[in-house]
Amino acid sequence: MIVNKKNICMSVYNTIISRRSIRRFKNKPIKIEILKKLINAARLAPSGANLQVLEYIVVFDKYLCSKIFDTIGWAGYIKPTWKPFEEERPTSYIIVLTNDIENKYYLRDVGLATENILLTAESENIGSCILCNINRDEIRKFLDISDSLYIDSVIALGYKGEQPVIENMKNSVEYWRDENKVLHVPKRSLKDIIHINKFSKT
């Protein structure tokens, strides 16, 4: 079989530029085979010194998903305080853990592994959102997580119930919802962050 590398590269790039953080989901379960695929993508991410200090809990049980939902702070920039309606909640979660909080590479590993999860989810048309405003003590308690593991973050997952749009960033990094409940996300322009051959002040 002839593999078109150009098409593969474009597919990867298109997946990257189409991915947005999703906070409203469809009430449709994700198959366990797909959830395992996401973890396998994380497993194969680069790891500082190849120490591989991350572990993951996959949660799709409805009762446990409800418990996790109650520990999460959602969309901090949106006022008044907002959270998804019951029918818009994530149908699965991934809890990201490290077994070595003192490892100097651990945060870099988390970034690499979680991006693999998000992009693989996007390729399956599954929305995702990394959440760090969480009640770690409560999550530890009802998921029976050992004290030797640090809970870094939670990734919410579900089939997309919204499609946020990108806006050119002007005066603020804060995202907002319009009157049609569409989420608008400011991003810095390419020309504002790229420097060719040397650093440019303008």
PLM region descriptions:
Residues 1-202:
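Acidic, surface-exposed loops and disordered segments
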